[in-house]
Amino acid sequence: MKSTTLKLGLLCAVLAGGAIRALALDGGVVIANPGVAADSLTADALKNIYTAKTKYWDGGQNIVIAVLPDKTDAALQQASGMDASQFKTFWQRLAFSGRGQEPKSADDAAALVALVASTKGAIAIVPADAALTGVKKIDIK
Amino acid sequence: MKYPNHKLILTLTATILAVGSAKAFELSSTTYSNLPPIDFHGYLSQGFLDSSSYNYLGDTTRGSFLFSEAGFNASMNPFPNTRITAQAFSYDVGQDVGKYDVGLDYASIEYTVNDYFGVRAGRVRRPEGIYNDIQDVDLARTSVLLPQGMYDARWRDFYESVDGGEFFGTFPLSKAGSLSYETFAGVANPAPDGGLATYLRSQLPANVQLDAVNSPVEGGVQLWWNTPLNGLRIGGMGEYISGAGDLTTVQTPVGPKNGATTYSVWVYQTSVEYLWKSWTLQTEYYNKTRTYPTGAYINSDSWYVSAAYRFNKWFEAGPYYTEYYADTTQRGNSLDYQKDAALSLRFDLKSWWVFKVEGHFIHGTGLLEDSIQPTPQDDRGWFMLAVKTTFSF
């Protein structure tokens, strides 16, 4: 009995550790411009980016957030802790008080991927089934 | 009913039509190959105020369209970790404040060393509570009028920006969330047609002329604890203002005589904001003490609670209740307080077009200070309607 309990406990610990290693955003994946050095981010680091606490990549390139309104709202909420309306208001406050730049937006997934591919420092959440041409995928841990 | 001047209406209308289908635009580095991209954004707001009794924020008993704001900004990142930004701004509140004069709202250069420390210098927006640095950005809230005892629309020229600089950053607190700070210092620049000048003129006897408003030195710190509970942040702000006051000329029987008034001000403000699902819940308390060289002082305070709920992409609504006391030793005198219950409806008609309508039931006349002499006593309450539309890009 004790050994069975121990094995189950170890199994739970392994499964929990595996879940912590990779965070799946609801229906979305994080992409970045190929010039961005990072290949992965922690969930906290991603949130810091989406809440303007981190504004620059290592090396000084400014972070440019790009969004796809309506299509990735659930994933955006996971990343930022804000729903789409709160997120938009948050960044408008920063942009019109001289403290930040409003995220860029695109009309569809292909346009968003193209925007990220052509914008230095860009990061975005795209639908999980989007073609990732010219961008790199960022793993969230 | 008071209308803005017609040339301005035509200019604003043309701008509205141009902005109506516009998105934020950017000068691409492919156009000017050595120039980093420059982002441009702007907004244009036009409002209407109508009150059942007493003129407040304009000639409102007859309905007033003299309630407008427009801003245009540009920003760029010319070097690593560096950003330059500036915004021009024009506004009008009633017939005496703002008058559509175009001014430099902010202009700064910012260098971010890391997440913990950055510096911003130039004309910077002053951080104070949830809304001080964005009080004229109609897009950034549900209501038309912010709680006026704390965010007086007539006083933005004095409270919104300082010429100086600030340090800013965020420290992680492990399981306790994080702590964000902004500490600022500089000189305020009250406008000759601003709210402070208008208020001072209204307080002077007939034989006294206001020559100038002092540009006081200010310094303070705003802290935000971003708690471990997602969406909850708690803030505290403290500030000291030195050398506020004015210069006057007094007409005496023996000729004009120069006069001067100076005082210092201590301010503190506490804030709580909770974003929970589609709710935005906020409460703040503000306290100000003005001290004269004689040692005499006046303490005033204000507080509010508000709740807003976003029903869907295009509709949000919410009430707020606020109280303001011009003199905390006179809390029972309706001449010295103003209590306001408001209900706001916000319609996001397009991503770039917002329309709001709002009703107020107000008791007291403590904030009518500069519009009517002598200030009337109110014991029954009065109503105010506020309507506003904003275009942005």
Give residue spans per PLM region.
Chain A
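Bacterial N-terminal signal peptides that target proteins for export
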Residues: 1-9
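Flexible loop/hinge segments at secondary-structure junctions
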Residues: 23-141
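Bacterial N-terminal signal peptides
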Residues: 9-18
